[in-house]
Design a protein with these regions (language model features):
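Cell wall/extracellular polymer interaction/catalysis modules
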Residues: 22-157
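Short, Lys/Arg-enriched N-terminal segments with co-localized hydrophobic residues
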Residues: 2, 7-30
Length: 157
């Protein structure tokens, strides 16, 4: 049986490992200026926001995310508009490498991952090949294509 102190130390150690991995990923992706993702939010609904994502000016996919709100509600609010660095790291939740947005004010762990509606996101961006007012569709292939393009650009940078 582990003592509470050992559990705290183990948790702290795991947190430090994650921070170290993020810092390594951030450093390896510095000065990668050949990639610009631009999200144009064009449909704002009470519970979700839909938009169009382009890579270097070329349409890539549609995005579903939480609603844009004047005040953040945990797990129900889209990230603020802004410029963010993106890295690809292992997601503990999804058990695979996914894009991660860094330095999003008042948010942590903002990923780009598959899903269809705001019920599948807690601030994250959900890609899809098609959409309607309820969300995005063909999310898995759209996400996989997007990850390949991001990875290629980061590796070429």
């Amino acid at each position: 049986v582990e003592s509470p102190k050992n559990k705290q130390l183990q948790s702290l150690y795991q947190s430090l490992q994650r921070l170290n991995l993020l810092e390594k990923a951030r450093r390896s992706n510095m000065k990668k200026d050949n990639l610009e993702l631009h999200l144009e939010r064009d449909i704002m609904l009470p519970n979700r926001t839909l938009g169009k994502l382009s890579i270097n000016g070329v349409h890539e996919c549609f995005i579903c995310e939480d609603a844009v709100r004047p005040k953040k509600i945990q797990g129900q609010t889209a990230i603020p508009a802004g410029r963010y660095e993106v890295v690809i790291t292992l997601s503990n939740r999804f058990k695979r490498e996914l894009p991660l947005l860094l330095n999003v004010p008042n948010y942590a762990g903002i990923r780009i991952h598959s899903g269809n509606t705001e019920a599948h996101t807690e601030g994250c961006l959900l890609p899809g090949r098609t959409r309607n007012d309820t969300g995005v569709f063909s999310s898995i292939p759209a996400t996989n294509d997007l990850i390949l393009k991001i990875r290629k650009a980061l590796n070429e940078g």
